[in-house]
């Protein structure tokens, strides 16, 4: 009998992470390669593994993540969100830990749009009095 594979989707900024998890040795793959090869910055690696560390399941599950869009930080946040959603469904005690750390909340902060008549979202064109 094949081990049960769990699935969840995580989002952050413009990144979308489809996450599959099954009992295993703690191997994490992102887009077909090792997580440390995909996430080049140490901060992104830490963000991605945070939910597994807090619930003490880092060595208990194999995680496969397919992530599209966004940058490195957005992709790491999306991966963490997806992993957290799976772990929350497994055990109510884990859900409490994840919720207390804010890992189950979809981070709604996205880039503010550029407005017409302005240089950027908030920046104005230089004003000349005379």
Swiss-Prot record:
The keyword Ribonucleoprotein applies. GO terms for cellular component: cytosolic small ribosomal subunit. GO terms for molecular function: RNA binding; structural constituent of ribosome. One of its GO terms (biological process) is translation. Keywords: Ribonucleoprotein, Ribosomal protein. It comes from the Bacteria. Belongs to the universal ribosomal protein uS9 family. PANTHER family: RIBOSOMAL PROTEIN S9, SMALL RIBOSOMAL SUBUNIT PROTEIN US9M. HAMAP family: Ribosomal_uS9_B. This is Small ribosomal subunit protein uS9. It comes from Desulfosudis oleivorans (strain DSM 6200 / JCM 39069 / Hxd3).
